[in-house]
Amino acid sequence: IKVCVKKQSGQVILMLERIIEKTNRYIEEMPKKERKKYGQFFTSIETARYMAGLFVIPEQTTVTLLDAGAGSGILTCAMIERLDKIEDIKEIIVTCYENDENVLSLLQENLLYMQECSSKKIDIKIIIENYITSQYLDFNHMLGGNWNPEKYDMVIGNSPYMKISKDAPEATAMPAVCYGAPNMYFIFASMGLFNLKDDGEMVYIIPRSWTSGAYFKRFREYFLTEGKLEHIHLFVSRNKVFDKESVLQETIIIKVRKTSEKPETVTITSSKSNSDFGELTSLTVPYDLVVAGSDYYVYLVTDENEVEVLKKLHKFDKTLPAIGVKMKT
């Protein structure tokens, strides 16, 4: 990879390191309450590289990438860093959605810096619009929408974490996946899957709350019908995923392929935090054990013992209420 050098204390800093450094300065200077308006939390360098490494890169000379809610461009940079090493790729077409005016100038500066550093031809488009409402006609196949919207080979994202009202424009734009007062993260993930080409891959870091409960049923039904989980990464520590942020939400990384064909297995990996991806535990679990039932619950097993327990549970053909056992949690 071509190295963009910046001397600091005798060290050579690579492209992504420099962008992380600039992002950290932005975090220090921008009040958290301002970033909270957009549900904005930035991805760590280790997490960004791990996410970029999960993709199976298409064997093409030109690849297209979407990063919605791009922030300062950390995930885009991690992808370009990886794609730069692949000789057959000649051109990378990048689309970033970002409508936070506070971070836009930093994003533009970082994307231009990536262009200078990369050995590839990089075409960049920043769309300064609301990622959801600007596409609601397309998503819902409504009159006036684009019947042939642009689709991407790869979608990467760290979506906003922000609960919105059931009457918010983003919620009313996507009734197929929303129930009650939804969270922006799963609305973004749904649109990301919509923006993906058939058989394309999407890697997102999102809270794990969507994996169960009636509240998320519409989202799970859409997401796991239109796409299939291939890889889930779990963090054992809930407070070490976003280094400089106070995020106590349990977070996971998911890799999804846009296909109707169900894979035989799902890979489930786990690490203690975002800094020890080199020390992963890994399980290969039958898909029907992980994604099960008409409610599309996702069971996040972490070891072989849990897999065996789940196999036994799935053999039960009745629920506890069905046999007269009432429970409260």
Task: Cite the ranges covered by each PLM segment.
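S-adenosyl-L-methionine
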Residues: 5, 13-58
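Signature of N6-adenine DNA methyltransferases within the class I
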Residues: 36-37, 41-50, 70-77, 89-91, ...
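Conserved class I S-adenosyl-L-methionine
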Residues: 62-71
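Conserved Rossmann-like nucleotide-binding pocket used by diverse enzymes
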Residues: 66, 95, 127
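Conserved S-adenosyl-L-methionine
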Residues: 82-93
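Short, conserved SAM-binding/catalytic segment
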Residues: 107-121
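Conserved SAM-binding strand-loop segment of SAM-dependent methyltransferases
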Residues: 120-131
